[in-house]
Structure formats: C-alpha cells, structure tokens
Design a protein with these regions (language model features):
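A short glycine-rich, Lys/Arg-flanked "PGG" loop and its adjoining helix->strand segment in the class I
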Residues: 101-116
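Hydrophobic adenine-recognition pocket in adenosine-nucleotide-binding enzymes
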Residues: 91
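Residues at alpha-helix caps and immediate loop-helix transition turns in enzyme cores, especially N-
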Residues: 35, 99-100
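A short His-aromatic
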Residues: 94
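Class I (Rossmann-like) S-adenosyl-L-methionine-dependent methyltransferase catalytic domain
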Residues: 1-17, 25, 32-76, 116-190
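Hydrophobic beta-strand segment of the Class I
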Residues: 86-87
Length: 190
C-alpha cells in the first residue's frame, strides 16, 4: 500500500540550497523512483544505503569493535565525500545505543558544519513500529509504502535519549505528528 504523507520540516532542508550548487545526499533506505525524480531537479550525487535490509545490526559476541567493523564495511563512501543532507527516516528506532554510536563514528568524517538531516522518532515509546519505506515526492510531501514484512529490532528511544545518542547533531526542530511520531530536523554539531 502506498500513501502520501505531508511533511512539516522537509522543506527546511532545502530553503538555503541553491538549485545550481552541487549537493551530496545520503538516503538511508532503498532507492525509490520518487526520490530519484525529486533530486533530478538538483545538481547532486545521491548515495543510497539500505541499512534497513541489514537489520538487526548487533555486536558479535567476543568480537571487539564488531559494530564499528560492520558499519565500516557497509558505509564505504569515496574519499572526500561530505554529505549536505542525510535522510535517516526512522532508522534510529531500529538500532540500539551501541549501533547508533558506531554508525555515527563511521558517518562523522563525511559530515561538514553545514550538514543537515531529517528523520523520525517516536513521542510515545509504546507506539507500534511503522514498518514503512519513505521517498520524497515534493518539498512538503513524502510517499510512504508499507513494508512487506516487519523489520526486526524495533526498540525506539525517547527524544531526550536520542538527543544524547546523536552526538554529532543538534536538534533544530521537532514536530509531533498525529500518529505520535516526531518529525525531526537536525544540523551537524561538529
């Protein structure tokens, strides 16, 4: 099932972007036609990284730094890649604290002081998992598809904990949505 969902904060990512400037985008999730079409209006390089297909991302017992190694293997970006926009969607609802720390350790060298990010969290920890795939259809609208199967590892974090975990980002704005999710706008804090 596919639906369109309004976004209160997505347009803020693009308000200071010059359509003629080069843009580098990290999209966590599969490459969907709506997102590719949306970004075709910009001079940009899209990096699609479907970490959702790797879930659950957990440390291997008795293997030191196994999470760091897993993310280093999954996130092999070309040297000199710096993301202007990161689209995390609801990834952090499916990652434990250690996995988030390792993910950010690997991502941080690819951020710059002007990097911005967008994502979703939950307002109520008892909120059911969304199990959705997101694509950008317009500056203020997302195309949302229901996943065929439930994602493993759903364990959302409260917003206060997420602010601590996402140490290389500052929470600029968050908006409570009707389904008790939080839409978040983040900026790099390096």
């Amino acid at each position: 099932m596919t639906s369109t969902q309004p976004s209160k904060l997505l347009s803020n990512l693009f308000e200071h972007i010059d359509e003629d400037a080069r843009l580098t985008v990290l999209h966590i999730g599969p490459a969907l036609p709506e997102t590719v079409d949306f970004f075709s209006r910009y001079r940009c390089k899209l990096h699609f990284l479907d970490l959702f297909s790797e879930l659950p991302i957990e440390a291997e017992e008795d293997v030191p730094l196994s999470l760091d190694k897993q993310f280093a293997e999954l996130m092999q970006f070309p040297a000199g890649t710096y993301f202007d926009i990161c689209l995390f969607w609801d990834l952090f609802n499916y990652m434990g604290s250690d996995a988030i720390a390792s993910f950010l350790l690997t991502l941080r060298p690819h951020l710059h002081p002007g990097s911005l990010a967008h994502g979703f969290a939950v307002h109520n920890l008892r909120s059911p998992p969304g199990d959705q795939i997101y694509a950008i259809s317009e500056l203020d609208a997302l195309t949302v598809r229901q996943r065929a199967t439930a994602l493993p590892g759903y364990a959302p974090h409260p917003q206060s904990r997420l602010k601590t975990l996402l140490s290389c980002f500052r929470f600029d704005r968050s908006v409570l949505l009707a389904d008790s999710r939080l839409e978040m706008l983040l900026s790099a804090s390096l």
